[in-house]
Regions:
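Helix-loop junctions and terminal segments of transmembrane helices
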Residues: 55-71, 250-288, 292-295, 341-348
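Helix-terminus/linker motif at the lipid-water interface of multi-pass membrane proteins
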Residues: 22-37, 159-164, 221-253, 267-271, ...
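N-terminal membrane topogenesis motif
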Residues: 1-22, 74, 81, 188-189, ...
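Alpha-helical transmembrane segments of multi-pass membrane transport and lipid-handling proteins
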Residues: 15, 52-55, 60, 81-110, ...
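Interhelical loop/hinge segments that connect adjacent transmembrane helices in multipass membrane
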Residues: 2-3, 140-143, 167-171, 180-224, ...
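Alpha-helical transmembrane segments of polytopic membrane transporters and translocases
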Residues: 26-27, 38-55, 212, 227-229, ...
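Residues that define the loop-to-transmembrane-helix transition and helix capping
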Residues: 4, 35-38, 77, 81, ...
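Short runs within selected transmembrane alpha-helices of multi-pass transporters and secretion channels
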Residues: 13, 17-21, 25, 43-51, ...
Length: 389
């Protein structure tokens, strides 16, 4: 399938990723309120960290390696089974650590039930094989499946979440969305003639590549999510609710820029692998132009109408999110240029170690500013830390 068709399907996916929150967030924010939204953000973000450890970098590493072998179905299946086996082992181990933490950390024992339900995507994370279809450039399946599952979730949300006490139902619906995605992926994987077998051969070779990508992914996710976790531990769920509404408003629209990058990632890796330098540079130029075209207008838009956006989108109770949103709007430019250099340039050119060093430096600054600013400034401090770091 061509880059243009893949891009269109990925645009469909990202339109659904944008449209779904636009429909659900105003409803959920007004039903649950600031504190419950903050609590939801805390438990889901914490689980995402554990999912990241369970994945061991398979999303980027697996997609890149499958892209290199996409012309050989048998080799693709063999590599899949090796990575899948490693992922099963890591998922079981990390799930065990997660469940232990629910009983061993005081702040978590108070919301143990919510965290246990939110952990469903972690328990079954080995079944998340989006990386396989991404490597094969099967974005049609990824997009249509995601749209279907979001529609199911939307119906469940509107029917079942009616008041503040329904937070646990909201968390359950969110978790089941991941599980349904996993099941559909596995179904089509088997239907297309691929097989699933445990295979630990070449474990050391694959594990080395996974670990390198894992540390890069870990550093990036710490940068993206540590603010939420630190606010949950160092401040209140109210401050977290205010901050999460601001940062979520920005991140909802981030896929507009990253959609082309995800579509081009397998092809860029393939062109680099076969030495097609002309096509490789042509695609990078295209990606850079798209980022420039989208990032600056979005930043200007949110700087100008942040107050009206918060009032309309979240309601009056979220009014304090206006300033954090204006601060976070700078991320449209900063984060997307970082994504371009890190993922589309360094990763596809096999400069993972350089990417890791750059990301770790950013994480250190982000952690430092979070520690300094969150205690005194709360949501505003987390917003500044995200931009500066």
């Amino acid at each position: 399938m061509s880059i243009k068709k893949n891009f269109l399907y990925n645009i469909l996916l990202n339109i659904s990723n944008i449209a779904f929150p636009i429909i659900t967030i105003p409803y959920v924010s007004r039903i649950l309120g600031v504190d419950q939204i903050g609590e939801f953000s805390f438990v889901t973000t914490l689980v995402e960290y554990f999912v990241l450890f369970a994945a061991l970098g398979k999303t980027l590493f697996g997609s890149r390696e499958i892209a290199k072998l996409k012309d050989n179905k048998r080799s693709c299946n063999r590599l899949f089974n090796r990575l899948f086996t490693i992922n099963i082992i890591s998922s079981i181990f990390v799930s065990f650590i997660f469940l232990l933490s629910l009983f061993g950390i005081q702040q978590l024992t108070e919301i143990r039930c919510l965290l246990f339900i939110a952990g469903i995507p972690l328990y079954f994370s080995a079944l998340d094989i989006n990386w396989f279809y991404s490597g094969l450039e099967k974005f049609k399946l990824i997009s249509l499946r995601s749209v279907f599952v979001k529609l199911v979730l939307l119906i469940g949300l509107l029917c079942l979440v009616k008041n503040k006490s329904d937070l646990i139902i909201y968390v359950l619906l969110n978790s089941l969305t991941f599980l349904i995605n996993y099941i559909i992926n596995i179904y089509f994987f088997i239907k297309e003639g691929f097989s699933i077998r445990l295979d630990l051969s070449d474990c050391k070779v694959n594990l080395k590549g996974l670990v390198l990508f894992f540390f890069s992914s870990l550093a990036m996710q710490i940068y993206l999510m540590i603010d939420t976790v630190m606010l949950g531990f160092m401040s209140s769920f109210y401050e977290l609710g205010i901050y999460s509404s601001a940062i979520k408003s920005v991140r909802i629209l981030m896929p507009i820029m990253t959609s082309l990058g995800m579509v081009m990632l397998p092809r860029l890796s393939y062109c680099n692998n076969i030495g097609n330098v002309v096509e490789y540079r042509k695609m990078l130029d295209c990606a850079f132009d798209v980022i420039n075209f989208c990032s600056w207008p979005l930043m200007a838009y949110f700087l100008c109408i942040a107050d009206l956006f918060i009032l309309f989108f979240f309601g009056q109770s979220f009014g304090e999110a206006t300033l954090p949103l204006r601060i976070c709007s700078v991320l449209f430019v900063v984060s997307n240029f970082s994504y371009f250099l890190g993922i589309q340039v360094m990763t596809t050119a096999s400069f993972e170690s350089r990417y890791l060093i750059a990301t770790v430096c950013g994480v250190i600054f982000n952690l430092l500013f979070n520690v300094i600013l969150i205690p005194s400034m709360g949501a505003r401090g987390a917003a500044w830390a995200s931009v500066i770091g």
